[in-house]
């Protein structure tokens, strides 16, 4: 496993079978490994945790906090295609997601009232 800090709240986590990108909004991404699925997480819509440019990445799935709404207006502003929107999952409450075979994302209860996938 390799973890790269990408400024403020951003991290790139490279596991043998998948790459995870968390809250990237600033700085350059290192070269992504070809052929390895990418999951992109944005915990919430604050500009220091989310930028619409994530949707230009060739990600297997985008896991978004519940305040990142894929309304028709936002989709138009962000240039989001139907194909990309179909790969977006909104996390909130206690739902689990299985964006890839063998990968399960399960929100855990927060320890504070700060922003979260909850």
Model-predicted regions and their roles:
Residues 1-35, 86-118:
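Core dinuclear metal-dependent hydrolase active-site scaffold
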Residues 26-71:
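Active-site metal-binding motif and surrounding structural segment of the metallo-beta-lactamase
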Residues 61-65, 83-92:
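Short hydrophobic/aromatic-enriched beta-strand-loop microsegments
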Residues 52-53, 74-75, 116-118:
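Short, conserved acidic/polar surface loops in the N-terminal third of protein domains
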Residues 71-87:
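Short, aromatic/basic amphipathic alpha-helical patches
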């Amino acid at each position: 496993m390799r973890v790269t800090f990408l400024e403020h709240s951003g991290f790139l986590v490279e596991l043998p079978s998948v790459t995870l990108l968390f809250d990237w909004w600033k700085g350059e991404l290192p070269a992504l490994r070809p052929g390895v699925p990418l999951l992109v997480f944005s915990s919430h819509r604050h500009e220091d945790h989310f930028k619409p440019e994530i949707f230009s990445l060739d990600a297997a799935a985008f896991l978004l906090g519940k305040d990142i709404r894929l309304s028709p207006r936002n989709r138009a502003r962000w240039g989001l295609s139907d194909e990309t929107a179909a790969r977006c999952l909104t996390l909130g409450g206690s739902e689990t997601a299985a964006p890839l075979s063998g990968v399960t994302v399960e929100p855990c209860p927060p320890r504070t009232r700060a922003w979260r996938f909850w």
